[in-house]
C-alpha cells in the first residue's frame, strides 16, 4: 500500500463572490497572492476531500477570489465553503540549504540553553519587524521573537527540536 503524501494547508475557502461560482480565499501564503501559483489543490473539510483545479484568480478589493473547474454557480460555490486548500510537499518550490517552511517549525519542541523544555511551537505570525513564535506549554501560550542568531540558536528537524536563547523569566506570564 502506497503512503499518502503529507498535505500542506495553503489557505481556506471562506465564502462566495457573486453568482458565477467564484469563491473568496483566505491565504496563508506570503505574499497572499502566492497561493495562486498553484493550479491544483487537494481540498479537505472534515472527512471529505476533492481535487480542485484553478481556472482563474484575482484580487477583488482586499479579498482574494478564485474560480475552480466545474464550479459554475453560487450554489456549487457555497458547497466549497470551509474547505482547506492543500498541496503536497512535492508541489512546494525547492528551498535552498538552510531554508524551511513555517509548517516545518510547527510542532517542534523548544529547548533553551539551560536544557529547559519551554513547550511546543503551535503558531507563527508576522509583526512587520520579524516573525514571532507562539509556544504552548501546558495550555499556556507565550511568544518568542523568531530572530535567527539573536534568539534562535539552531533547528534540529530530524529530532524535532528548536534550540533558543530564551529564559522563562523574560516572559511576562511566567510564574
From Swiss-Prot:
An individual GO BP term: rRNA processing
Keyword Phosphoprotein on entry: no
Keywords tagged on the record: Chaperone, Cytoplasm, Ribosome biogenesis, rRNA processing
UniProt keyword annotation of Cytoplasm present: yes
GO cellular component: cytoplasm; ribosome
Main subcellular location of this protein, as a coarse class: cytoplasm
Compartment list: Cytoplasm
One Pfam family this sequence matches: PRC_RimM
Chain ranges of the PRC barrel domain: 97-170
GO MF term list: ribosome binding
Function recorded in the entry: An accessory protein needed during the final step in the assembly of 30S ribosomal subunit, possibly for assembly of the head region. Essential for efficient processing of 16S rRNA. May be needed both before and after RbfA during the maturation of 16S rRNA. It has affinity for free ribosomal 30S subunits but not for 70S ribosomes.
Domain notes for this protein: The PRC barrel domain binds ribosomal protein uS19.
Family: Belongs to the RimM family.
Quaternary data: Binds ribosomal protein uS19.
UniProt-recorded name of the protein: Ribosome maturation factor RimM
